[in-house]
UniProtKB/Swiss-Prot annotation:
<dbReference type="InterPro" id="IPR032675">
    <property type="entry name" value="LRR_dom_sf"/>
</dbReference>
<comment type="similarity">
    <text>Belongs to the ATP synthase subunit s family.</text>
</comment>
<dbReference type="GO" id="GO:0005739">
    <property type="term" value="C:mitochondrion"/>
</dbReference>
<keyword id="KW-0496">Mitochondrion</keyword>
<comment type="function">
    <text>Required for the assembly of the mitochondrial NADH:ubiquinone oxidoreductase complex (complex I). Involved in the assembly of the distal region of complex I.</text>
</comment>
<protein>
    <recommendedName>
        <fullName>Distal membrane-arm assembly complex protein 2</fullName>
    </recommendedName>
</protein>
<comment type="subunit">
    <text>Interacts with incompletely assembled mitochondrial NADH:ubiquinone oxidoreductase complex (complex I).</text>
</comment>
<dbReference type="GO" id="GO:0032981">
    <property type="term" value="P:mitochondrial respiratory chain complex I assembly"/>
</dbReference>
């Protein structure tokens, strides 16, 4: 029985020695490999971040190029068929709708082919209303609408690219424009609304839900003073100026209890 015990004891010592050597090797290798992994991870994240930035810039430039293409001037159509048809084609391609003078129905993108088939009939018919709600119109694209000198109603609500510079061009429609909607345009501020003082023929103006306007109530009051003959739709300025309950003045309409 002594021999087996000796073998077991010898095997245990040999195993413990190997374990210590392995543990020692792991202590020598682990810090270097950990630092190497950390460098590799940081390099990967750095390269990956640069790739994401490059991709974002590429997609942004691609989107800008697409918007600019959609807002190009329809010079050939205007030279061939006149400004009314060119303006109508531009709006229809943007996904909006137009209404010609003395016509009961609006022309929308779903019946654009019918309009194009009879395009010559509209050469001398003024466009009196444009609904460009949600369209990607920008400063450049407005050039297709400014020649519409008989335009009475223009809806530009929720147009993401419409900004203050765009509003500075609308004075060219001052002679005819009576209704204008700018509701929900995220890039329009008080500075752009100040440019509307040229539009003295306006009878209805919607400036509701403009997130870039810092003081909607006060802005509406100023616009109403600027356009005294126009109905201005916007924020409930009375509610915005309402005092908090603890700051309300005392009610003097009822007698005080003794």
């Amino acid at each position: 029985m002594a021999a087996p015990r000796a073998v077991l004891h010898l095997g245990a010592r040999e195993w413990n020695g190997r374990a210590r050597r392995i543990h020692g090797m792991s202590e020598l290798v682990t810090p270097d490999s950990s630092r190497e992994k950390k460098r590799t991870l940081l390099q990967f994240l750095s390269d990956h971040f640069q790739d994401i930035q490059t991709l974002r810039e590429y997609l942004l430039q691609k989107q800008i190029s697409k918007v600019n293409r959609e807002n190009r001037s329809f010079t050939n159509i205007q030279e061939k068929y006149g400004p009314y048809v060119a303006g109508a084609v531009f709006i229809l391609k943007q996904g909006g709708a137009v209404k010609f003078q003395d016509k009961e129905e609006w022309i929308r993108p779903n019946n654009r082919s019918h309009f194009l088939a009879e395009i010559q009939k509209f050469q001398n018919v003024p466009v009196e209303a444009v609904d460009a709600s949600g369209c990607a119109i920008n400063y450049q694209g407005l050039s297709n609408l400014l020649p519409l000198k008989e335009l009475r109603s223009l809806s530009l609500q929720r147009c993401p690219n419409l900004d203050d510079w765009c509003l500075s061009r609308l004075y060219l429609l001052a002679g005819s424009l009576q209704e204008l909607s700018l509701a929900g345009c995220p890039r329009i501020s008080e500075r752009g609304l100040a440019c509307l003082h040229h539009l003295q023929n306006l009878r209805r103006l919607d400036i509701s839900d403009l997130p870039a306007v810092s003081h909607p109530g006060l802005t509406q009051i100023l616009v109403e003073e600027m356009l005294p003959h126009c109905e201005v739709l916007g924020a409930d300025w009375a509610q915005n100026l309402k005092l908090e309950p603890d700051k309300q003045p005392p009610d003097t309409s009822t007698p005080l209890s003794s």
